[in-house]
From Swiss-Prot:
Named cofactor requirement(s): heme
Major location category of this protein: membrane
Biochemical pathway: Alkaloid biosynthesis
Gene that this sequence comes from: Cyp96T1
Protein name: Noroxomaritidine synthase
pH relationship of activity: Optimum pH is 6.5.
Amino acid sequence: MATSSSAWLMFSDHYPEILIAIACFLIFSLLLSARSSSEDSLPYNWPIFGMLPAIISNNQFNDFTTARLRKMGWTFIFKGPWLLDMDYIFTCDPSNINHMFNDNFENYPKGELGKVFDIFGNNIFNADGDLWHDHRKMAQTILWDGNYRTMQATFIRNKMDNALIPILDSAASKRKPVDLQDVFFRFTFDTSCFSVLAADPESLTMEFPAVPFSKAADQALDAALTRHITPRLIWKLKRFFNVGSERTLAVAWKVIDSYIYDKIAELKAKRKLVGKINSYDAVSFYMDNFNIHDDKFLRDNAFTYLLAQRNTQSLTMTWLFYALFENPKVELKILSELKSIVDESSERKFNDGFALFDSNMIQSAIYLHATLCEALRIYPPVPFEIKDAHKADVLPSGHKVRAGEKILFSPYAMARMKGIWGDDCLEFKPERWITGNGTLKHEPAYKFFAFSAGPRICLGKELSFTQMKMVVATIIYNFHLQMVKGHVVEQSNSILMDMKHGLMVQVRKRSVM
């Protein structure tokens, strides 16, 4: 005991600064715990550290932010660490969002934030000004082309027939649970690769093979989130020394580039061998209609299209089924609507006893469309976004914005505000999207932000709805899914609103024909 005491005294004499640091850390931790105990209080603004400790110590960022925005009247100032330019304005006020995306659109470009997402390259996602207008015109030409849409619809139907239905049928026969989120990620990866690169990676098979590209894409987005909550100087130093999340990003970047460049090379080689092929994928469209053959340009745009389609659709469908598990009456209404469509359709398509819904059949599925809207409202695939102010401004809420200041706005929080969506905002209620005449109700994009708003509103919105309705209708009509008992659904702390543990389901064949 004496030896131990002597050693402690010697340590304290020679390294007092370490003891002080340890003591400060313990006190800091206790205070942080106390300060964080109130669910809806504004994060405490610490000397030096600002409010950042409250964010870092919380594992449910979206709910954490929602509670504070509700308490503070939809907007509050987030103070970051001193001298590191990390102050934010947090908001879910629709008038502020309308201001940034419509009324004062030019003052909120991608700007510096484009550097955070530099892996996307120089494309419609990161571009501003004339370059962005040029990208958007080309994207509109592609996404609204009849041949492009027909090609996608045909491939999706075939993918359901040859992959999705057999996998769910097998799961039902073997009574083996499947991760529905993983199924949707694989399905949309296959369909997006075909529509962008004319290639089917066949990731959705009975074997559920590893998909290096998808893993790399997820890692890249996580690294981008890390950049958002890390001082710019720090993440740039990490990039320079190739350590931590920046090292992970660099490795993921190589995987992404290797896959896309290889597919572009294969497509070009095929075209060179057989001449111009009758293909309406996005990359071929750029080459044939716009005479653009630059590999870097094609890579940047291909990556954007791939992620946009894969992530939005897969996550929306995943959360929709979770909502149906919690609201079985909604599923019964969808099923009733689908039965009527099948009974009245002259284009009934069955294969091995399973009904397949095509793009024509689901046009009249109003309640299903409303259910998708409700899933997108409550569970937006991108729960928050960040804007940079080019010049000083004043938001409609009265908050002053400095030039260069960042604004984080939360569609996730907006969906949970009674003053925006009514007293029943927390209910999953597709009926809110249907008028008294039985038609779909329109909500302004700055309120229903799932597809962005203003000049940057998503060009593929209706196409995305059509594709998701085909898939969801085919699953619900042919199968009854139930969440595995005891499975825990938890949001990931990510730029995307994916489920941390997936969505494990049991599958049973349905007899409705």
